[in-house]
Amino acid sequence: MKKVKHKVLARRKRKIEKRLRRKNWTNQPKPMLKASNIHYQMDGRHKGIAYGGIGAIHLMVKRSGFIKEIDNAVHLLKRHLPYHESDHVLNLAYNIFAGGTRLQDIELQRQDEAWLDALGAEVIPDPTTEGDFLRRFSEDDVIELMETINRTRQRVWDKQPKSFFEKAILNIDGTIAETTGECKKGMDISYNGLWGYSTLAISMAQTREALYLVNRPGNAPSHLDSAQWIDRSLDLVCDRFKQVWLRGDTDFSLTKHFDRWDERSKFVFGIDARQNLIAIADSIAERQWEPLLRKPRYEVKTKKRKRPENVKERIVKERGFENIRTVSEHVVEFDYRPVKCKKTYRVVALRKNLTIEKGDLALFDDIRYFFYITNDRLMTPQEVVYFANERCDHENDIEQLKNGVNAMRMPADDLVANWAYMVIAALAWNIKAWYGLLTPNKVLRYQILRMEFKRFLNTFLRIPCHIIKTGRSIVYRLVGYNHYLKDFFRTFQAIKALGFT
């Protein structure tokens, strides 16, 4: 970082710290927010944008070779008058980085001359043109777009330290992408009565990247055609990571494929509590069951405080609602060979001792079983359960795809067109992860990977800038400040110095 830039940051930091320093205030006669004589003026010389971080994002995308990769692999336009395929894809993704939630929001950027100058564009596609672009996709085109993203993803991975490649954990799950539309092709009613599409999502736990997203009719079961996408995910990671894990719920316990997956990876899947498994668990002697002790949610580092009243629990008791309370949990393991497998696998049984309550009355006790099947022989039964439960974090990734980048808003009128938009919108989520992986600050790297998309926008994208076009460059002159700017500049310099091959 240049000395001048460092001095400016240090000065701004000192000023805001001085302003926010705790003071012994006297009683104030007026509210703190007392601005009244407010005027607006138009600056005739300078042009600015609110999302100044888009320059660093665009440079990273360009340096990674992603733009050339799209134009070489995805062919939807016979002639480029004037846009290329990469222009459309990035325009849709950058709309999300500018806070857009719908195709119509593109028009705001299109009318902003400073935004166009910031990206070096004469003009960008309008919302109607983008809708037409999405309708041009076939299933093969969407798959090729995902593979193009994955090739760029691998180049970003290749810049990581050796420790990054010790283990890859792939989370697999399905979700319903609801829509209020009535004329969208491919939509159907799901198992829970919602109209929309059934989406398969495969992501990597460490980086939260969406590796594959598959759009299907709303009545499709979660596991439909999932085996081929799991195979593609294994192809993506197996050559780079020393150990690969698959993790999913009972819907993805596809025993027909276990023997094949066993040769390439470790896996832990939930498995339905069928009568044969329950009978095996019941036949195991009580002395073989081991207690499952859950880890505390947090560790008290100072002084333990008195817990506040549990309002939810009090209301449940007062109104006589039925409540299921866990009394104890025990685990045991045994070998089991599913009918469609040639190999024998390890099953961990979790037995929950429950009490069914209504108000202050304990109605009866109940025993429920949960089963997990794995090809790993090293973890303890308790660790298998903990590992399987960590899959719940995948729900947070799906929530961010739904409400962070709005990838499942379904703006088009066709299943494949909506699939294409889903993949492109998820590209914004993936770019966030790539930016985090290229951040020199190791602590901040982890924070970015765990950040919600909204916070990432507010921290690294929503940086007000003047846009100045010179003869050979585009200058983003920052006029705002936050305490992440030092790391922002370090990451920008790291991106400029990287050479992708």
What residue spans do the PLM features occupy?
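Domain-level cores of phosphate- or acyl-group-handling catalytic modules
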Residues: A220-N276
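Dynamic "connector" segments at or just before major functional cores
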Residues: K2-N219, S226-D239, W261, R462-T501
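Secondary-structure capping and boundary motifs in well-ordered enzyme cores
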Residues: P82-D87, L194-G196, L415-V423, E452
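Short amphipathic alpha-helical "interface-anchor" segments enriched in bulky aromatics
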Residues: I106, P381-A420, I424, A428-Y435
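C-terminal structured "cap/appendage" subdomains that terminate the fold
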Residues: W434-R477
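An acidic- and aromatic-residue-enriched active-site/binding cleft used to recognize and process polar
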Residues: Q111-D112, T175, A205, N215-R216, ...
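An anionic, glycine-rich sequence signature occurring as long contiguous blocks
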Residues: K2-K5, L9-R11, W25-S36, V268-N396, ...
